[in-house]
Amino acid sequence: MTQQTLYTVTVYSENQVGLLNQISIIFTRRQLNIESLSVSGSAIEGVHKFTITTYSDRETMEKLVKQIEKRIDVLRAFFYTDDEIIFQEVALYKVPTDKLLDDRSIEDLIRKHNARILEVNRTYTVIEKSGHPDETQSLFEELSRYDVMQFVRSGRVAITKSTVEHVSIFLSLIHISEPTRLDVI
C-alpha cells in the first residue's frame, strides 16, 4: 500500500449550481474521503474557491485534479501538501457559563490557547479558537472536563505560499490568448 498524505485541493470555478455535487462524485469514484471542505468567493471577482482536504498518494492526486479540471465550470484545480500552504480552521466551543465563573482555570485555558470569548449569557459561553486541527482538538480535549455542550470545527481555509494566486496567471494567459466566457469576469 502506498503512503497516504493529507493533501489540500483547491478548485477555482465559476459559481454554478451542482458543481459541488460533481466534484464530490469524482472523490467518491476514486474512493477518497473528503476530510474537510470550505467554499467561498476568491480574490478574483466572479471566481469561487473550493478548499478540500483528503488523504491520498501523489499519483492519485494528479489524476484527481486532472479529472476535476475536465468539468466545464472548473477553471483550474491544484493540490498541495501542508508545507506548501498556509492554512487555518476555526472551532467554536460552547461551555456552561457557571463552570466558567466557578473555575478560573477555564480562563487560563482560553489565554493559553490564544482563544477568545464570543458570547456570554446565563446558560452558556461560546469560545472561538483558530489554528491547525491539532490545536483546536487540544483545546477541545482540555475543555471536555468542563462539560462542553457543543463543539464544531470549520473546514480548512488555505492560501499558497506563492506571491501570486496560481489561477490568476492562468486567467491572464487565457485572456491574452483567446476570448472566452471568462472575459466577463
Residue ranges and their predicted role:
Residues T5-S13, K49-F50, I85-T97:
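Short glycine-/aliphatic-rich beta-strand segments at the starts of folded cytosolic domains
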Residues Q16, T54-T60, D98-L100, G131-T136:
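Helix N-cap motif at beta-to-alpha junctions
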Residues I23-I25, K63-R71, S105-R111, L139-S144:
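Short amphipathic alpha-helices in soluble, non-transmembrane regions
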Residues I34-S56, T81-F87:
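Short, charge-patterned binding micro-sites
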Residues D57-T97:
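Helix-adjacent hinge/juxtasegments
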Residues I72-E84, A115-N121, D147-K161:
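Conserved short beta-strand edge segments in small beta-sheet-based binding/regulatory domains
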Residues D82-V126:
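Long, charge-patterned amphipathic alpha-helical coiled-coil/hairpin "stalk" segments used as oligomerization
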Residues I174-I185:
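Single conserved hydrophobic/aromatic residue that forms the stacking wall/gate
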